[in-house]
Amino acid sequence: MQASIESTGNLERRLSFSLPEDRLQSHIVGRLGEIARTTRIKGFRPGKVPAKVIEQRFGAQVRGEALDGLLRETFDAAVREHDLRIVGSPRIDKGDEGEFSFVATVEVVPDFGDIDVSKLTVVRHTAEITDADIDQMIENLQNQRRTWAPVSRGAQDGDLVAVETWSQAGEERLPAEGTEKGSIVLGQGMMFETIEKGLVGLAKGEEKTLDVEFPADWRVPVLAGKTVQVTVKVAEVSEPVVPAVDEAFIKSFGVKGGDVEQFRSDIRANLERELKGALMNRLRREVGEQLIAAYSSVEMPPRLVENEARAMLAQQVEQIRRNGQSVGEIPADAHEGFKEAAAKRVLVGLLVGEVARINDLRLEAKRLNETMRLIASTYEEPEQVIEMYRNDPQLMSGLQNRVMEEQVIDWIAERAQHTEEKLSFQDAIRQ
């Protein structure tokens, strides 16, 4: 098969090719024959259904399947014939040279020139899990299970305070009648600092009027940019009651026997997983920034960037909806605001792929299995999760891509000029 190629842009190519009609017809005839031998149709004995009936019932479907399959096969052959390294999905249209002629418009990988990763400068962060980190996590778990006990003393940091508030902005009272009711844990920045500090020391039934400065962009226009008198009245003060780290508490986290050392060991393993992911994210970001700085002048495939920008917009919209917020009507050009970030993401992705290709880097089975088992270990039935990955090609493909990217990022970092910077666990996981 011969396919002609035309350059229609710096990174765009147009392939013109025709499907071999004899192969298409041969495939259709063969497939209809298979169906005739195996299908059961009422009124006919198996294998004795007339060809005309088979054609009427299955002809259009078989022809469509054959055409799609041969189109993919012929397109792939044309790409190999012209040694094209394409990115994204092709746009395939009907050609002008007959029923079986097609034109495929594709984008290709840009020329990055000599990719010398040894010229990059990368900071590689390290961190370790300490006993103090485990203690902190246990304290966090205790706080997650805390209950609240009413007290008669004045409120202090860490207390849960039920409050009633109302504001006076000039002649206007908010709300016009009654009060706004709510609860806050003091010291967590849930209200204006002036209000939280004003509540410290107040007991149930006590109130105080405070001068509070509202920011210019405050959501209530009548308060925005003004200093307003806010009255707070304490309805209830409760102190936290955290459970003891006893056998029952430990068992509630799935540790059989309630053994404290096993509990700490499990927590360490969880923190190690979290730390490993956080350090890889930092390294991915570090390497990505260096690649962007070194190759930002290289033109990116426009359609690939456009698709990435739309995907980023869709991801943000979905996140907003998951948070229970309304999105409203999305402007047709809303994705334009994501194009700069999309171009950087595309640049890094293509460079990582080129580094892997040029240096013949292959996916390491050991690393893939380790990552799969690491993911599975966070579930109650890890072997079922592993089996799910092995039986789902799409799921496995996503994992393979992720592991391969991490493998290449590591490879680049090892060969770049790099320094190490040690962080605490808390600093390391702070993205």
From Swiss-Prot:
Its EC number(s): 5.2.1.8
Every PPIase FKBP-type domain range: 158-243
Reactions that this protein is recorded to catalyse: [protein]-peptidylproline (omega=180) = [protein]-peptidylproline (omega=0)
GO BP annotations listed: 'de novo' cotranslational protein folding; cell division; chaperone-mediated protein folding; protein transport; protein unfolding
InterPro entries in UniProt: PPIase_dom_sf (IPR046357), Trig_fac (IPR005215), Trigger_fac_C (IPR008880), Trigger_fac_C_sf (IPR037041), Trigger_fac_ribosome-bd_bac (IPR008881), Trigger_fac_ribosome-bd_sf (IPR036611), Trigger_fact/SurA_dom_sf (IPR027304)
Gene Ontology annotations for the cellular component aspect, listed alphabetically: cytoplasm
Pfam families found in the cross-reference section: Trigger_C, Trigger_N
Keywords, comma-separated and alphabetical: Cell cycle, Cell division, Chaperone, Cytoplasm, Isomerase, Rotamase
Annotated disulfide bonds: none
Keyword Chaperone: yes
GO MF term (any one): protein folding chaperone
Location in or out of the cell: Cytoplasm
Family: Belongs to the FKBP-type PPIase family. Tig subfamily.
Job description of the protein: Involved in protein export. Acts as a chaperone by maintaining the newly synthesized protein in an open conformation. Functions as a peptidyl-prolyl cis-trans isomerase.
Protein name: Trigger factor
Organism whose genome encodes this protein: Stenotrophomonas maltophilia (strain K279a)
